[in-house]
């Protein structure tokens, strides 16, 4: 369903906040709309309706099946009987399942797959995951002309704009098939359409995008209260970008990513729901954006997808494009250097990390998880603050990702 921008502004809670707080002060007035991520008002929640999606019920049914299989696997693994079985298996190896162990994540996985139940469940999950990606990919390629024409209609349309750079030098680290998505984010023309339906088994709050709203609502603003320009770095298909615009409707909001296909779909969605944001294909190591341009730069679940040798370059670039007093809002897995960090060293915890690394193609995640990320922020000149609330992954995990704030000294 298309929602006209003027309709949204006339009826939504965001519009009420604009009218109340901004009055006639104009675009430069700070308007900060508070939204409950897990109880969004209908007029905002409806903006997250899937603009994309399948055109045919048989494709939808296949996706529902693989989603259901994964739900069964997850529920089965959590059953007390399965937990007791795994504990008995580890005890047969003279290992207390609750104890930390001195072995690598891969060694822990190789130990657990000696248990037939664990091995079968892990194999079924990986095969089902492949089918879950394959279904939308086949569906969109089967009707490629239709979907390409749909995006062509909005490529040059507003509100907002799309900036693609076919000559951009894509880092090798971004060419991996992240999350095991065939073709990856940069090599698959329908990456955005496929990602929306396949990521997190299609259950990543597609109805209300609670994670994106939680991510942006947790952001700390600059001390002087000025928020005119915001950048969502590694924006993917643009959920966080739109959520930043919902929170700060008067701000100029950018979404930047190296993946052109994701940005093309992000812009398509933004046009369809009438959101005025800018999506631009750039490399986070060297964006080409002006010094001190942004008041807030945010990244959500981005840095663990960046190669270790590139992380410092990206962090230096974030520091450069923030104005003095500007804020970097970081949401990702907890690492060393965080005051609440406790490394998981049980056999099951280590094996789970290995499965995520290999079966979910999280190529750079192990290195990120073992890094001192707050230390990296300090190394480029940020003052680091841990006081902001965590961001959630879903209504069932409302505080699952820590927030780390970097403040550029004035």
Label each PLM-derived region with a short phrase.
Residues 231, 237, 241-286:
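Class I SAM-dependent methyltransferase SAM/SAH-binding core
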Residues 2, 7-27:
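N-terminal export signals
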Residues 96-185:
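N-terminal auxiliary segments of SAM/dcSAM-dependent transferases
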Residues 329-395:
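C-terminal alpha-helical "lid/dimerization" subdomain adjacent to the S-adenosyl-L-methionine
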Residues 205-226:
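Conserved alpha-helix/loop element of class I SAM-dependent methyltransferases that forms part
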Residues 285-297:
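A short acidic, Gly/Pro-enriched loop at the edge of an enzyme's catalytic core
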Residues 180-185, 189-210:
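Class I SAM-dependent methyltransferase Rossmann-like catalytic core
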Residues 312-324:
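A short glycine-rich, Lys/Arg-flanked "PGG" loop and its adjoining helix->strand segment in the class I
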């Amino acid at each position: 369903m298309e929602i006209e921008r003027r309709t949204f502004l006339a009826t939504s809670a965001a519009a009420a906040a604009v009218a109340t707080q901004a009055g006639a002060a104009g675009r430069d007035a700070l308007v900060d709309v508070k939204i409950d991520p897990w109880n969004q008002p209908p007029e905002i929640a409806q903006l997250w309706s899937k603009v994309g999606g399948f055109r045919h019920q048989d494709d939808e049914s296949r996706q529902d099946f693989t989603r259901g299989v994964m739900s069964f696997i997850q529920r089965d693994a959590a059953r007390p009987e399965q937990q007791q079985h795994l504990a008995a298996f580890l005890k047969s190896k003279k290992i207390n399942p609750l104890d930390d162990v001195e072995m690598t994540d891969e060694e822990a996985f190789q130990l657990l797959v000696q248990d037939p139940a664990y091995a079968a469940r892990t194999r079924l999950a990986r095969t089902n995951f492949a089918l879950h990606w394959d279904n939308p990919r086949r569906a969109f390629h089967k009707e490629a002309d239709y979907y390409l024409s749909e995006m062509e209609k909005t490529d040059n349309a507003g509100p907002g704009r799309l900036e693609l750079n076919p000559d951009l030098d894509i880092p090798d680290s971004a060419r991996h098939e992240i999350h095991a998505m065939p073709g990856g984010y940069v090599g698959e023309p329908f990456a955005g359409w496929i990602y929306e339906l396949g990521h997190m088994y299609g259950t990543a709050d597609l109805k209300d995008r609670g994670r994106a709203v939680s991510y942006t609502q947790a952001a700390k603003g600059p001390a002087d209260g000025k928020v005119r320009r915001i950048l969502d770095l590694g924006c993917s298909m643009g959920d966080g970008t739109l959520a930043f615009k919902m929170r700060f409707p008067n701000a100029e909001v950018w979404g930047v990513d190296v993946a052109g296909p994701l940005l093309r779909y992000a812009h398509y969605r933004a046009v369809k729901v009438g959101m005025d944001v800018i999506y631009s294909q750039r490399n986070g190591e060297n964006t080409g954006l002006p010094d001190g341009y942004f008041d807030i730069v945010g990244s959500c679940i981005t840095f663990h997808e960046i190669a270790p040798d590139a992380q410092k370059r990206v962090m230096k670039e974030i520091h450069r494009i923030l104005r003095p007093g500007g804020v970097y809002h970081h949401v990702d897995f907890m690492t060393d250097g965080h005051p609440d960090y406790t490394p998981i060293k049980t056999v099951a915890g280590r094996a789970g990390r290995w499965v995520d690394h290999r079966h979910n193609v999280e190529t750079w995640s192990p290195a990120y998880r073992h890094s001192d990320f707050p230390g990296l922020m300090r190394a480029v000149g940020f003052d680091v603050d841990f006081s902001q609330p965590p961001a959630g992954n879903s209504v069932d995990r409302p505080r699952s990702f820590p927030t780390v704030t970097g403040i550029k000294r004035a």
